[in-house]
Amino acid sequence: MMPIFSNRGKKKIVLPLLQYVYEQLYSMNFRDYCFVVGREKRSIEDHFAPHETYLRDLEGNYKKTMKQFYEKLDKSHLVWINQNKPLGFGDAVKRSERYVVTEDFIVHAGDVTILSKNRHPVLRLMDVAENNPDVKAILLCKKVKDLKRYGVPTIKKLSKDLFSVQEVIEKPDKPKSEFGILPLYYFKSEIFSSLKKIKLGKGKEF
């Protein structure tokens, strides 16, 4: 629920980052959402539950923004899943299996926002999936300086902007490429069988 400044009307207003991410995805016609959350679940779930009394007490641009947010929520289907222990991103994805079943799906960490001057990265991932139907997982990568903060892929170049991933090492001491993986993914449901095979990694996380 970290804040982000958003220009709505003539004034800047502060929105929770997760709301901004949700509204980005909503603008791309996503309507089904599965939130995997830990201890802070209550504040997140409360924010995503329309509250008419709260709305009546608001004023100006913020009231208009929240009213539009609630209208979007009313047209969305939200599911909440608990992650009782902080076992990492892989564990969070694995917990969504009963909701996803056999569908292709997007995973967004929700604690960062990814901006683009051109086509949004989510849509670019979907483009790659449509053009490569046999690919089971698509990752978004970027050249970064501090590679020890990222998952780092070993890659083989296929085209200007497309690479085949051979392996991924989380926060490596000796990185094998100059790319870090950003927290935005496109998966087919086969990812769940792969997640069940991996063991705890660095920091005792999946």
Residue ranges and their predicted role:
Residues K41-R42, P86, R119, K188, ...:
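Alpha-helix N-cap/helix-start and coil->helix boundary motif
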Residues V122-L123, E130, S159-F206:
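Catalytic-core segments of class I nucleotidyltransferases/pyrophosphorylases
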Residues Y54-R56, Y62-Y150, I155-K157, K196-I198:
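Conserved beta-loop-beta/alpha segment of the NTase-like Rossmann-fold superfamily
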Residues I4, P153-K157, F187-K188:
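Short beta-strand-to-turn element immediately C-terminal to the catalytic PLP-Schiff-base lysine
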Residues G9-I13, L158-F163:
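Short, solvent-exposed loop/turn segments that connect beta-strands within catalytic domains
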Residues M1-E59, K63-K64, R119-H120:
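N-terminal glycine-rich phosphate-binding loop and ensuing alpha1 helix
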Residues E40-K41, K143-D146, P172:
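Glycine-rich beta-alpha junction loops
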